[in-house]
């Protein structure tokens, strides 16, 4: 039984507590079946979501005890944002009906994994063509390579802004740990696409694409399994996964609107700059080839296929000049830089005044959230813990007297009483 002190209506996370003897180390919850009570809750959630047009599709256990995941079917960005808000409201409401509490805080319990969102983002034309579909021969797909390198340029140029879009007080407890992507923005492409980019940079031309091949299981009785040419790399904050990018930094309580506004706008800028070059070109094929190579070379530093959790990557990112923005307070200024203001005003997304207003609101929200947590901790300590400790000191004092009267050494009890009394004095001075 987990025993922690929590006031969800105040902070959404535990402020004091102790780890139970067993946490998530056995992975038995992650790989286990959904418990009947949770399955009943999820069934009702699905029904309520389907009623209002949210296509909830899958649900499964996650790593931490009592942690679960839900995934809807893809939709256009503005609709998906609304759907996500409805999902969060529905989860909370249905949980109460089942006698449970749905915690959407990014780190509700210390010592076990927190929660986040995976924002699966792609670009599709009005006639249904996915611009991020590499096809079977990515090295020959000029349209895909141009779109890909434009995205690399956008993410490299505006990494600070993309990091800011996922800034949240709760995310400060989660990002960079071995459960979530690091606070350093990088792009994972997978072996196949990274090889194509390397060919473009080293030789000026991509002539082939790596194939996935077959996965050798070592068991003769099993059929051969097709091996994908790429991978998911869950340590990456912005990973290419087949025909889309997966932005994994968004906090579990946050709206996905900010992340998608930033992604759409920075990529629109990269597209616009590419258009300015290509529309003036006399030889379009030569110009697009040179532009793809130029963008690949200029933005290669943002590509990283390795372990984002490792300390080696932090040092490598610093060597590459990539920003490592560790907290929300450090991230907010990115919203009001001259670069950001120019970007958003150019495309009519936000004015300078609107950006400054949003930055001010975020500063205020952060300060209030931290202040509420601090005041709640003080309130809990004064009204719950200190009275309980004082009561315990009386019990210890009575025990010391009783043991001494029995003619037995009471030094252990006396020493414990003295230590607790000293702690109480420090607490009194701090108050």
Model-derived features: where do they sit?
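Beta-rich nucleic-acid/ligand-interaction surfaces
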Residues: 1, 65-69, 105-122, 171-175
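Conserved small/polar residues in nucleotide/adenosyl-binding loops
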Residues: 2-8, 426-430
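Conserved oxyanion/phosphate-binding beta-strand-loop segments in alpha/beta enzyme cores
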Residues: 7-15, 42-63
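Residues forming anionic-ligand binding surfaces in small-molecule and nucleic-acid pockets
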Residues: 10-29, 60-70, 249
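Helical (often loop-to-helix) elements that flank the catalytic cores of nucleotide-handling enzymes
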Residues: 11-13, 79-96, 123-155, 257-262, ...
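Accessory "access/gating" subregions that flank catalytic or transport cores
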Residues: 24-54, 70-75, 92-96, 100
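Acidic, glycine-enriched catalytic cores built around paired aspartates
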Residues: 41, 48-51, 94, 109, ...
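A short glycine-rich, hydrophobically flanked beta-strand micro-motif that places a catalytic Asp/Glu
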Residues: 58-59, 101-109
């Amino acid at each position: 039984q987990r025993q922690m002190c929590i006031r969800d209506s105040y902070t959404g996370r535990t402020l004091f507590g102790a780890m139970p003897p067993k946490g998530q180390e056995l992975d038995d919850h992650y790989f286990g079946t959904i418990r009947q009570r949770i399955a009943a809750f999820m069934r009702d959630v699905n029904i309520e979501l389907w009623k209002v047009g949210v296509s909830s599709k899958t649900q499964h256990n996650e790593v931490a005890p009592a942690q679960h995941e839900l995934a809807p079917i893809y939709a256009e960005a503005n609709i998906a944002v609304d759907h996500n808000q409805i999902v969060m409201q529905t989860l909370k409401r249905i949980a109460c009906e089942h006698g449970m509490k749905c915690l959407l805080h990014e780190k509700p319990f210390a010592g076990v994994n927190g929660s986040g969102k995976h924002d699966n983002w792609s670009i599709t034309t009005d006639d249904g063509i996915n611009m991020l579909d590499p096809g079977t021969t990515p090295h020959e797909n000029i349209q895909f390579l141009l779109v890909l390198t434009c995205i690399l340029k956008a993410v490299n140029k505006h990494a600070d802004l993309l990091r800011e879009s996922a800034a949240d007080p709760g995310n400060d407890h989660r990002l960079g740990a071995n459960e979530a992507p690091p606070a350093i923005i990088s792009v994972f492409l997978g072996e196949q696409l990274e090889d194509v980019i390397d060919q473009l940079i080293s030789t000026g031309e991509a002539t082939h694409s790596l194939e996935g091949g077959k996965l050798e299981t070592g068991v003769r009785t099993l059929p051969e399994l097709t091996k994908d040419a790429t991978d998911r790399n869950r340590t990456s904050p912005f990973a290419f996964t087949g025909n889309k990018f997966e932005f994994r930094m968004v906090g579990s309580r946050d709206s996905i609107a900010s992340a998608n506004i930033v992604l759409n706008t920075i990529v629109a800028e990269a597209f616009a700059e590419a258009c300015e070059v290509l529309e003036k070109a006399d030889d379009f094929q030569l110009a697009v080839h040179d532009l793809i190579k130029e963008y690949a070379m200029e933005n290669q530093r943002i590509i990283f296929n390795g372990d984002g959790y490792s300390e080696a990557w932090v040092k490598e990112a610093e060597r590459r000049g990539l920003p490592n923005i560790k907290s929300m307070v450090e991230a907010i200024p990115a919203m009001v830089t001259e670069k950001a203001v120019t970007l958003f005003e150019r495309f009519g997304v936000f004015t300078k005044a609107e950006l400054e207003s949003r930055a001010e609101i975020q500063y205020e929200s952060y300060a209030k959230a931290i202040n509420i947590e601090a005041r709640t901790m003080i309130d809990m300590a004064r009204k719950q813990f200190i009275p309980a400790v004082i009561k315990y000191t009386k019990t210890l004092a009575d025990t010391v007297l009783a043991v001494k009267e029995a003619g037995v050494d009471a030094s252990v009890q006396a020493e414990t009483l003295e230590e607790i009394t000293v702690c109480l004095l420090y607490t009194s001075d701090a108050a």
